[in-house]
Design a protein with these regions (language model features):
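Structural recognition of the beta-strand scaffold that forms the well-ordered cores
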Residues: 73-74, 103
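Short, conserved active-site loop motifs that form the nucleotide-linked donor/cofactor pocket
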Residues: 48-50, 135
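Short acidic/histidine-rich motifs immediately flanking catalytic phosphotransfer sites
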Residues: 67-73
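Residue-level recognition of oxygen-bearing side chains
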Residues: 61, 71, 303
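Cofactor-binding loops of NAD(P)H-dependent oxidoreductases
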Residues: 54
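Oxidoreductase cofactor-interface core, primarily capturing Rossmann-like NAD(P)-dependent enzymes
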Residues: 2-43, 57-60, 64-67, 78-87, ...
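A hydrophobic C-terminal alpha-helical subdomain
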Residues: 232-313
Length: 313
């Protein structure tokens, strides 16, 4: 296989970091775009990646990052600005002659989405489609890593969440990275496609609690609660928080981005609305794309929990 250079954005995040590592392991050159120097960026540098620092919303930064790469992975965080960032990225990619862009969207991205972030992702997909670039959209269900955000509750033996009886097949970030790598290495087979991504088995949250209990060897109790109660429990180690406790501080920088709806943040509005989507079946489904494109069977929920046992114990 010939060595090529690929740009990985969001390189200090879950899917971006895994994509960069897998690309390097396969002998490719990786240029990783990061927002700032930190231990995650230093780790990628230690693995051999060229780490560059820049802003998605600065055209000069994006042009410099894309210069000379064969393909790129575009992953924008849950914050305002994705439509502008997509337009800048598409323009710079066309100028640089990039052969393929893999766009991380989400399964809830649709024209009538109530989540502003999800609707923006749908519009960002359309911007890429209009660009004339070879683009592949990925629409994953809930990441298996979402359970790590719930770890304070799980450590307390609880899984109190607002997702009703909806089902999803949790998909690990490293499995999504395998798909990203597979597409970028063979873009002609995938250009113009939109792929929903799932783990191997669907679960309700009661089912997830049952798997947690079995793998961890302790009871994890499921209960349907309100969205705000879940946030409070996430931020307080699974216990009822004291009066005045600010659960939303858990999300740090997300709280700096207000939503179009007064009194809410962009991320909180998204999380609240996709919880309703989950109840309504939007996140349901399963397929074998991790194996057929990524070349490896998707990680089971049991294996993911066992791998991260220390976080849940």
């Amino acid at each position: 296989m010939s060595q090529r250079t690929f740009l990985v954005t969001g390189a200090t995040g879950d899917t971006g970091g895994a994509t960069a590592e897998q690309m390097l392991a396969r002998g490719h050159q990786v240029r990783a775009l990061a927002h700032r120097q930190d231990n995650r960026a230093e780790r990628l540098q230690g693995l051999g990646a060229e780490v560059v620092f820049g802003d998605f919303l600065n055209l000069d930064d994006v042009r410099a990052a894309l210069l000379g790469v064969a393909g790129a992975y575009f992953c924008y965080p849950i914050r305002p600005g994705i439509i502008q960032a997509t337009a800048l990225f598409a323009q710079a990619a066309k100028e640089a002659g990039v052969k393929c862009v893999v766009n991380m969207s989400q399964i809830s991205a649709r024209e009538d989405a109530k989540s502003h972030a999800a609707q923006d992702h749908w519009l960002a997909e359309r911007v890429f489609d209009w660009s004339g670039l070879t683009v592949v959209h990925l629409r994953p269900t809930y990441f298996a890593e979402w359970l790590l955000y719930l770890a304070p509750m799980i450590r307390a033996g609880l899984l109190h969440v607002p997702f009703g009886t909806g089902r999803h097949a949790p998909i690990a970030a490293e499995d999504q990275a395998r798909v990203i790598v597979g597409i970028l290495e063979n873009p002609s087979q995938h250009g113009g496609k939109a792929y929903p991504l799932y783990g191997p088995v669907e679960f309700t949250y009661q089912g997830i609690a049952d798997v947690l209990s079995r793998v961890l060897g302790k009871e994890v109790q499921y209960k349907q609660v309100s969205f705000e109660t879940m946030l409070q429990m996430m931020a307080s180690g699974g216990q009822k928080p004291p009066a005045g406790h600010n659960a939303r501080a858990l999300y740090g920088e997300f709280e700096q981005a207000p939503d179009r709806r007064p009194g809410d943040s962009f991320a909180m509005q998204h999380l609240r609305e996709v919880a309703i989507d989950h109840q309504n079946g939007v996140f349901a489904g399963t397929n074998d794309l991790v194996e057929t494109i990524g070349g490896w069977p998707a990680t089971t929920l049991e294996a993911f929990i066992d791998k991260h046992r220390a976080a849940f114990a």
